[in-house]
Amino acid sequence: MLHAGKYIVTDEKEENGLANTQQDRFKDILKEYWGYPDFRGIQREIIESISQGKDTLGLMPTGGGKSITFQVPAIAMEGVCIVVTPLIALMKDQVEHLRHKGVKAYAIYSSMQRAEILKILDNAVLGGVTLLYVSPERLSTEQFLIKLKHMKVSFITVDEAHCISQWGYDFRPSYLAISEIRKVKPEAPVLALTATATPATIDDIQDKLGFKQKNVFRMSFERKNLAYIVRETSDKKEQMVHILESVEGSAIVYVYSRQKTKEMAEYLQQAGISATFYHAGLEHSTRDERQTMWQEDKVKVMVATNAFGMGIDKPDVRVVIH
C-alpha cells in the first residue's frame, strides 16, 4: 500500500487479498453461528454488495434465506444494523434466535414500556447492540430520531420492502418514514429485501429508498419442494376437510373475505379440525395471539385473507389451500 499525499494507492493484488479476507470472514460467521458450510443462491453477492457500502435490493423467494443476508454482515461490521419490519412476531422470533446464538439483538415494538425502549436505544448509542429491529411506525418518533443521530449505523435493512411502493399489493404509508432515517444517516447504505415485486415495484422501491444507483440481485423463484394441484369438485368444503385430515403438519386456508375466515374456521372446528382465523380487521394483539397459537401448534389450520403470510417461518406447513 503506497501513500501519495492524502491519497492511498492500493494495487489490484492487495485489493483482491482484502476482498478474499472479508469473504472468509463472512463464511466463518456463517459456519460459527448457523453451522452452514457455505452460502446459497445470491446470499454471498448481496452480503458483499452491502458490505461495500452499496444500496442493494434483493429479490428472494420465501425460504430463500433472506435473514442470512443481513444478519451475517451485521455481525461482521462495526455499528448497529437497523432492521425495519412490520411484523412483531417475526421480530421477537429472530431476536430470540439471535440472542440464543450470542448475538446482541434487540427489538422495539408498540407494547413495550417507554423506559425499556430508552434503555435499548441508549445501549445502541453506546455500541451494545448489533441488530436493532424496529417497526416502520417507530422511525418517525422524535425519541427514535434523536437517539439515531448518536448511533454508529452499519447499514439499514428494509424487510418486506414492497410495502414502500404504491405499486405493491401491500402498500404501507408508514414505510415512507424510512427516507427520514436516510437524511439522518446518509452514509449508511440500505439493504431492501422482498419476495414479491413487479418491475414497476422494483423501480419504485429503489426510488422511494433513495438508492444512489440501481443495484438489484434476483434469485430464482422456482420452488422444487412445492407441488401445485388443481382439483375440480362439487363440494369444496368436503374436499377441504378430506385434504386436511389426510395431511400431517400445519395448514393455511386462504379465503376471499374477512367474514369467510370466521365462517370457514367454525366449519372446520365442527368437523373436528382445530382452526383459528386471521384478517386485517382484527386488533393487532388478537392477530399476534392467533399467529402465535398456530406457530406453537396449538391449532392446525389458519384460515385467513391475504393479510396473513408475510414473515411466516414454519417448517411443518404441508398444505396451503386457496
Describe each model-derived feature in a short phrase.
Residues 19-20, 24-33, 37, 41, ...:
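Helicase motor core with emphasis on the C-terminal RecA-like subdomain
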